[in-house]
Amino acid sequence: MRRVILATSASEGAESYGHLMIADALDRARVPFWTRATTIRNAAELIQALDRGAVDLVHFTDAAAAAFAPMSREYAATASLFLDSPPLSSRARDDLDLVDLTLLEAEGLVEGLNCQTSVIGPCLDVDAFDPAVTNLPREHLASVDDESRMLLALGSDDDVEKILAELSDEVAAACNIIAMCSAEGSALLNSPPRIIALLQHAEAMLLGEGSHFHPQISLHAAAAGCPIIDCMTSDPRDWADEISSMHNEWRSAGGVPRFPDEEAIARVRNTNGLRAYGRALEKAWNVVISQ
């Protein structure tokens, strides 16, 4: 069994989601053949932990913690960067440049880094989204829901009226589009259960050219078994026809809600689920310590 020190600049109780996620993966044995030796929060604690020995790797869960490592370190070191990480200062970039590998949640985070990087992707607790495991009632949406109309979620900051204008009058009138990025949508979706309930019960999520409700909203939708309709095509008839076809199926079924897309859920679980993320950490760490 290999041992890793987790290093964070945050005080106890104020750790980032990314740090807690990696710590949980180690503590629940989701990183095969790796265990957490300890967590340290400053350079002095790191020296003490290393002096105790039996450590294979130090992993910095935020860029500020990478400053704990001396330039002449004699141990393997990796770091993580997440989409919600604070903007990097030039000093933080210099510190990350000294680690052996930085694991990125998304490709866009590589900008400005000179160190070796690997895109590990996001980690998602798919069970929280999967309606077969956590089935959230439609009543969470009662204030805006109308079960006589086809429920759609708009996951980007786009104009609902422009979308409706591309549909026939009949289909437009039958659609209840919840604009997640609007003031009304933000007021409704003020808790994870409500967001997940919308993804579980919407016939589809529409994604346009505007900024997304969440950087990983398409992944969240897939984990909830919610189909995604791409509204960014050059010809709006492409997605307008798709919505119309979906409406025909919904109407033919008597307005009965769709079945979850089980294949989409399985894909997310296999690529970004908790165990998949643990295996990705194992692979990255094994490469570093074998160099």
Question: Where do the model's predicted regions map?
Answer:
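Short N-terminal targeting/anchoring amphipathic segment
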Residues: 48-65, 81, 204-208
